[in-house]
Amino acid sequence: MKRILILIHVLFCGYICPLLAEDTGAVRYQDSILKVADTLPATLVRLTYLRDMAYKHQYAPYNMTFSTRLYEEARRQKNAFYENMGAYYLAACYDKKHDPDSLSYWVDVLKDFVSQVGTYDYYLEQKAAISRALASKRQIEKAVYVAKETLEESKLRHSNNGMIAAYNSLGCAYGVSSRPNEALDAFLEAYRNFSPQTKTSLKVDILSRIAQVYGNGGKDSLKLPYLHEMDMTLQTVISKEPETRKNWSNFEIDCEVKYILHYMNQKNFTVAHEHIEKVKKLLEPHVDPVFWLNVQLIQLQYYAKTDEYDKSIALIDEVTPTVLNNYVSTFATLIN
C-alpha cells in the first residue's frame, strides 16, 4: 500500500515520463519528409505538400518542424495564404505547450493576415487559445477578459469558429477557478452554436468538456448523450481521414477514460475492463504524457475497486521506473 501511495503522490504532483523521446526512427522519418519537400519545385506544389504534412502531423515531435517549414517556405514564396496556415499551425503548437507569450506573438501575425486571407477564423480561434494558456497559469481574471473580448470580436466578425473557441476558453477559465455552473453555461452555449462550419476539433473539445462537468457532478444521464456524440464525431472524422488518426489520439483516449469512469461508477466492471483494454491500445509514443498518466491512474482505480491488488502492484512495478527516472516536466494543470 505504501508503494501505491508513493506512486500516486508522484503522479499527481505532475512528474511524468517523456514518452515522446525523439528516437532515431522519428528523426529519420522527419528528415525523409523534408527531403521529399526539397525535391519538389519551389512553387505551389511544394507548399501544398508541406501543408499536407503539417495537417497530418499535429502532434510532437513533428508538429513544430513541419509547421515551421511550411511557414518559412510560404514566406520565401510570398504566399500569404500558406504563410497564414503555417502561422496558424505554429500557434497551435504553442497552444499545446500552454505558452501565452508565444501564442500572443503568432496571434498578432495571424491578425495581420486577416485582410489577405478573407477570414477571421484562424486569428480568433488562436486568440481564444491565449485565454486557456493564461488559465493554466492561474491568471484567471486575465483569461476571462481575453475570452470575453474574443467572443465579442467573433460575434462582430461573424466568426463561428472564433465564437465556439471563445466560449470554450471562457468555460475553461471558470472551471479552473472552481465555478462549474458558469463553466457549463459557457460550454452549452458553444454547443448550441455548433454549425456545419464549426471545426471538428472544436466540437469534440466542447463535447468532452460538457461530459466532464456533468460527470463530475454525478449527472450520468445528462453526461452520456454528449459522451456518445463525442465518440461518434471522433469515429466519423477518423473514418473519413484515416491518415490523420494520430491527431485525434488524445481525444480518443479522453473519450475512453470517460467511458471507463462511467462504467466503474455503475459497477459494470466487465464493460469498464473492455474500455481499459481498448484505451491501452491507443498508448502509442506520440500520445501526450498527460493522457498516458490518466490511463495509468484509471487502471489503479479499477484494480482498487475490483480488489485486484496483485495487478495493482504489477502495474506499479511496470510504470514506476519510467515515471521516476524519466520525467521531464511538471504540468501546472491537467486537462479540464
Report residues per predicted region.
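Sec-dependent N-terminal signal peptides
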Residues: 4-15
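A "functional boundary" signal
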Residues: 20-336
